[in-house]
Each structure stands twice: as structure tokens, then as C-alpha cells.
């Protein structure tokens, strides 16, 4: 896995604008991928950011009780701090099956795992807001383990 690439989004836009890729994912040939959208930004209701998501998760669990959910958080994230993730996850009231099990990668602490009924919460040690960018191996390990479970 490569080190953090600060301009990685430029590569994504170029890839998604490739005519072969657009054709493969059934996107109109005249559509153009852009990193940001003024139309989306103008339509965004900033008061939505303060709405709690717990009712959404309650509805998801009611409709699909056997669904497995993964939430991960970089423990060095200063935008969405890990404590905030913990607060809303614990407020869901799901049964805790396994608490704060350390996860190791190559003999080093990579984070901690808390398993709930239907939900796994992972911290990724040393990761910032963009876990795959700042700790790619640790993030990949979390995703691989979750998908294998």
C-alpha cells in the first residue's frame, strides 16, 4: 500500500471521466464527474448536519435485522472525533458482545474493536479523518476482517 497521496481525488475524477469507465457503469457519455458540485452545495440544508442519525439506524435495523454494519473512526480524527462516534453508537442501545479488543497488525497496536449486536465499531490507531489515506494498511485490515466475519 502506498503512502498518503494528497491529490488522490484528482486521479478519481480522471478515472470516472474515462469513456470506458462511464460506459461500464452506464453513465451518459455527456456526463462529467466533478469533485464538488455547486448544485448539490446550494441544495444542502446545513441544519441537517445537526440531526441525529440514531432514528435512521433504528429504521435500518427494523427493516433488516440481520444486517451487519461497520463503523470505523480514526483515533487522530479532529473533524469527527472518536468520542462522538462512541456516543451515538452506544446511544443505539445495541447489546455489547465484545468490548475493546485490541487489534494488532504486524505485532503493533492497530486499533480497538467493539462488537455489538449487528454492529462493529473499530478505531484505527494513528488515522486521521481519511483513514484509508493516513493508515491504509490498518484500514484495509479492518475492512478485510469485517467482510470475512
PLM ranges: what are they?
Residues 1-149:
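Terminal and linker regions of secretory-pathway proteins
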